[in-house]
Swiss-Prot record:
Keywords: Capsid protein, Disulfide bond, Host nucleus, Host-virus interaction, Late protein, T=7 icosahedral capsid protein, Viral attachment to host cell, Viral penetration into host cytoplasm, Virion, Virus endocytosis by host, Virus entry into host cell. This is Major capsid protein L1. GO terms for biological process: endocytosis involved in viral entry into host cell; virion attachment to host cell. The keyword Protein biosynthesis does not apply. Belongs to the papillomaviridae L1 protein family.
Length: 505
């Protein structure tokens, strides 16, 4: 009896087509017009470990300013479509729009190189596990100590037209909350959030939410024990479809472990008995195996500096090749090589005592930072064809709204009520409803706002970064003062008459 059976050969179907993301160079035309823009000296001063609230006669808080915080600058640029251009025939406002492209940047850092310390007066350290003479698991109940460390050394620069994305580990949710008992290890969850100005960086203790995952408040130094340390999510930003969050990045990290300790407290996960052989006396039961090193960033040197030098953007890592959508730029900076903390001392008496008494002096600590930002922007045009506008609308409809393009609503078929006496008290108030204000998409996020709308200049040779740009571009500047050589006039060969020779007879 013959039976039918399906073929063993597998048939592979082609994958479904996906919408193609094009590079900005495919629909953005670059012009030969460049502008320089730069900030004044940017300074910030504060307490390196925590925010000091108002007290006594002080009417303002002292902010937390640490070298281990992200500095995120939100840079506002002028609208090029309302810009005074040198050539009126540069573009057609009916069919084109102008945008800025960032082609050069230099991040200036002031202040000398230095190493700043952080620590905790009640740091959770039990034993020196590198060379411990004995186990102290049966020693005092509180083994915390005053410890200071020098954090991991980090230099970082991320530039894009949207904020950079950070990642950290936070306390997750259990599938069965009713089964969670006090003292159980919480589940972990990877969280992605925008990096804001003032967020703490990874200092060598990991990117995590210490306020919810370390309830002893003594596992890490003071400045991060109740904070969230974020690490840039390079994987997500590199895989960004449109490449807006990271045109390019510069980073340098350095770390080694200086001391090796274990943590005090009850060990939550017991060591399996098959992993060791029991001892006697103080070795009857193992001590805490929850080991934790103290990080160190080691030596700082001017040979490994990423700042105070120009960078030119020729090709971005993503599809956005430096186009500043919404006329703004986000610059994320970290520099721990200038982390010196100032220690200040003042006397509590009217005059400085002649004999030192520590009870007559107060000690304070402060941290200062200094920045100088310079940019080179290139003017670009976009021809508003149907395909380009459709693509931009799919990418970000707010861009077309900024260009005064919008979708016209369909005509209304319903009747509209119109009253005769608008000022009459017999009818409802006829005041027009206020126009809805445009909401900032980054409302509620903290950035260092920098306004460059009135600081653009086309005289590149008048600024340090502009001269460097002209040098690398191979452009020779023309002299503006002093004597100029006149162009040589073309000389025509004069026709000389042949003289007759006298012949002697």
């Amino acid at each position: 009896m013959a039976l039918w059976r399906s073929s063993d050969n597998m048939v592979y179907l082609p994958p479904p087509s996906v919408a193609k993301v094009v590079n900005t160079d495919d629909y953005v035309t670059r012009t030969g017009i460049y502008y320089y823009a730069g900030t004044s000296r940017l300074l910030t001063v504060g307490h390196p470990y925590f925010k000091v609230p108002m007290s006594g006669g002080r009417k303002q808080d002292i902010p937390k300013v640490s070298a281990y915080q992200y500095r995120v600058f939100r840079i506002s640029l002028p609208d090029p479509n309302k810009f005074s251009l040198p050539e009126s025939t540069l573009y057609n406002p009916d069919t084109q729009r102008l945008v800025w492209a960032c082609v050069g940047v230099e991040i200036g850092r002031g202040q000398p190189l230095g190493v700043g310390l952080s620590g905790h007066p009640l740091y959770n350290r039990l034993d020196d596990t590198e060379n411990s003479p004995f186990s102290s698991n049966k020693n005092p109940k509180d083994s915390r100590d005053n410890v200071s460390v020098d954090y991991k050394q980090t230099q970082l620069c991320i530039i894009g037209c949207v904020p950079a994305i950070g990642e950290h580990w936070a306390k997750g949710k259990s599938c069965k909350p009713s089964n969670v008992q006090p003292g159980d290890c919480p589940p972990l969850e990877l969280v992605n959030t925008p990096i804001q100005d003032g967020d703490m960086i990874d200092t060598g203790y990991g990117a995590m939410d210490f306020s919810t995952l370390q309830e002893t408040k003594s596992e890490v130094p003071l400045d991060i024990c109740q904070s969230v340390c974020k690490y840039p999510d390079y994987l997500q930003m590199s895989a960004d479809v449109y490449g807006d969050s990271m045109f390019f990045c510069l980073r340098r990290e350095q770390l080694f472990a200086r001391h090796f300790w274990n943590r005090g407290g009850m060990v939550g996960d017991t060591i399996p008995t098959e992993l060791y052989i029991k001892g006697t006396d103080i070795r009857d039961s193992p001590s805490s195996y929850v080991y934790a090193p103290s990080p160190s960033g080691s030596m700082v040197s001017s040979d490994s500096q990423l700042f105070n030098k120009p960078y030119w953007l020729h090709k971005a890592q993503g599809h956005n090749n430096g186009i500043c959508w919404h006329n703004q730029l986000f610059l994320t900076v970290v520099d721990t090589t200038r982390s010196t903390n100032f220690t200040l001392s003042t006397t509590t008496e009217s005059a400085v005592p002649n004999i030192y008494d520590p009870n007559k002096f107060k000690e304070y600590i402060r941290h200062v930072e200094e920045y100088d930002l310079q940019f080179i922007f290139q003017l670009c045009t976009i021809t508003l064809s149907t395909d380009v506008m459709s693509y931009i609308h799919t990418m970000n409809p707010a861009i077309l709204d900024d260009w005064n393009f919008g979708v016209a609503p369909p005509p209304s078929a319903s009747l509209v009520d119109t009253y005769r006496y608008l000022q009459s008290a017999a009818i409802t108030c006829q005041k027009d409803a206020p126009a809805p204000t445009k909401k900032d998409p980054y409302d509620g996020l903290n950035f260092w706002n920098v306004n460059l709308k009135e600081k653009f200049s086309s005289e590149l040779d008048q600024f340090p970064l502009g001269r460097k740009f002209l040098l690398q571009a191979g452009v020779r500047r023309r002299p503006t003062i002093g004597p100029r050589k006149r162009p040589a006039t073309a000389t025509t060969a004069s026709t000389s008459k042949h003289k007759r020779k006298r012949v002697s007879k």
